[in-house]
């Protein structure tokens, strides 16, 4: 990327960006919600479009001079609808959290009952956590996974739905490694007369490429982020049935947002265009393959994987048999250049600031070009540093640098 002007006008920020670039280049990024956007996406993000206010929607703006940004937003909408085959799309949400909030506010009233996945079982803050707006504004009832299988307990979902009669049921997760049965959840929604919303933020790319069943035929509303498996800019989007289009659009603007970020919407359009290409499907195929190899290799080292493995891009590792907390494992791995995040596991006994697990994912390393061989090396390194945590780890640190040197980012 060209930072010639920034290097002259603000050396402090320029230098920190260079340090972050070095960090990304020289570490192995295994945080499941992160990825590396293309140069094209970043160029759109850094364009003159950042200068334009465009409150409203294409052809219905509250500002003049929107002819060109109208074309961009229309392209983003058109491409997103083509990817997922949905009836209506809104590309203005600044984040996945705001996309979720807009859906709730579009058809529900504060205090209404909603069902969502328990955060410690793999759900998300915006699916009813009491510290989040969702849990403060609405009466959330949590469902979770079966204690033995660690898979979503659909019988429990149905039982809770019949008991609490929610106005909406939310599916989707931030740390669930298995296929979600949208058809079954839709049947439960229909049985109790609830709206069905799916937050596909983590698995949107897999759905786009055909590596996870789509929620679009079943859900009234589908929300997503654009920066995880879709490899776009940080932002959100909403898909919905046409009959809810006006309510959703009003919930975003003027409901919870003002002017859309047109430079971000342009970058979203670029990433949607990338997701429509054949090589994107090849990328997602490799993401899934890499996750499966990591699963197999980690099992060889006696790591306990929540639910026994993965069907998607991420794995949740239960570290209780390794006598180390998620917090300590995260710090230890970070010391050699492997970035993961501590994560609660189902039926967690430790604080969310400590945790019994770590979450790892393959989208970012796959974007770099890592394949099966690197996954084997990564699994070896994870095991090595945890087993030898009190030893000198300089050899492992050098190995991480060597692996990274094979696949340079942003050449």
From Swiss-Prot:
SUPFAM superfamilies: PLP-dependent transferases (SSF53383). The modification N6-(pyridoxal phosphate)lysine is found at residue 228. The record marks 227 as: Plays an important role in substrate specificity. The keyword Disulfide bond does not apply. GO terms for biological process: glycine biosynthetic process from serine; tetrahydrofolate interconversion. It catalyses: (6R)-5,10-methylene-5,6,7,8-tetrahydrofolate + glycine + H2O = (6S)-5,6,7,8-tetrahydrofolate + L-serine. One of its GO terms (cellular component) is cytosol. Gene3D superfamilies: Aspartate Aminotransferase, domain 1, Type I PLP-dependent aspartate aminotransferase-like (Major domain). It is found in: Cytoplasm. Its cofactor is pyridoxal 5'-phosphate. Its EC number is 2.1.2.1. Homodimer. Belongs to the SHMT family. HAMAP family: SHMT (MF_00051). Catalyzes the reversible interconversion of serine and glycine with tetrahydrofolate (THF) serving as the one-carbon carrier. This reaction serves as the major source of one-carbon groups required for the biosynthesis of purines, thymidylate, methionine, and other important biomolecules. Also exhibits THF-independent aldolase activity toward beta-hydroxyamino acids, producing glycine and aldehydes, via a retro-aldol mechanism. This is Serine hydroxymethyltransferase. The gene is glyA.
């Amino acid at each position: 990327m060209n930072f010639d002007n920034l290097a002259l006008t603000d050396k402090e920020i320029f230098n920190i960006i260079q340090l972050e670039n070095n960090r990304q280049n020289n570490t192995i990024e295994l945080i499941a919600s992160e990825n590396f956007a293309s140069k094209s996406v970043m160029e759109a993000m850094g364009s003159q479009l950042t200068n334009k206010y465009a409150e409203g929607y294409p052809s219905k703006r509250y500002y003049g001079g929107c002819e060109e940004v109208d074309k961009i937003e229309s392209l983003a909408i058109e491409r997103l609808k083509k990817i997922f085959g949905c009836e209506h799309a809104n590309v203005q949400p600044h984040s996945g959290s705001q996309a979720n909030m807009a859906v709730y506010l579009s058809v529900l009233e504060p205090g209404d009952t909603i069902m969502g996945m328990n955060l410690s079982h793999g759900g998300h803050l915006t699916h009813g956590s009491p510290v989040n707006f969702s849990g403060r504004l609405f009466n959330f009832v949590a469902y979770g996974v079966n204690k033995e299988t660690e898979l979503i307990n659909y019988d429990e979902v149905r039982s809770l739905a019949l008991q609490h009669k929610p106005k909406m049921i939310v599916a989707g997760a931030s740390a669930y490694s298995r296929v979600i049965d949208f058809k079954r959840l839709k049947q439960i929604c229909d049985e109790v007369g609830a709206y069905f919303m799916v937050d596909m933020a983590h698995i949107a790319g897999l759905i786009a490429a055909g590596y996870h069943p789509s929620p679009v035929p079943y859900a009234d509303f589908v929300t997503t982020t654009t920066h995880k498996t879709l490899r776009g800019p940080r932002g959100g989007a909403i898909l919905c049935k046409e009959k809810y289009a006006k309510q959703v659009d009003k919930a975003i603007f003027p409901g919870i947002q003002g002017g859309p970020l047109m430079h971000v919407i342009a970058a979203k359009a670029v990433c949607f265009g990338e997701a429509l290409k054949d090589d994107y499907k090849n990328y997602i195929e490799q993401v899934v393959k890499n996750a499966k190899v990591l699963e197999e290799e980690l099992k060889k080292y006696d790591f306990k994987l929540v639910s026994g493995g993965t069907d998607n891009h991420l794995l949740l590792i239960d570290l209780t048999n390794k006598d180390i907390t998620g917090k300590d494992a995260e710090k230890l791995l970070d010391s050699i250049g492997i970035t993961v995040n501590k994560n609660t596991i189902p039926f967690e006994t430790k604080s969310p600031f400590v945790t019994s697990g770590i979450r790892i994912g393959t989208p970012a390393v796959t974007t770099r070009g890592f394949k099966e061989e690197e996954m084997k090396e990564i699994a070896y390194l994870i095991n090595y540093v945890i087993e030898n945590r009190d030893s000198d780890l300089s050899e492992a640190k050098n190995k991480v640098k060597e692996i990274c040197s094979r696949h340079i980012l942003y050449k």
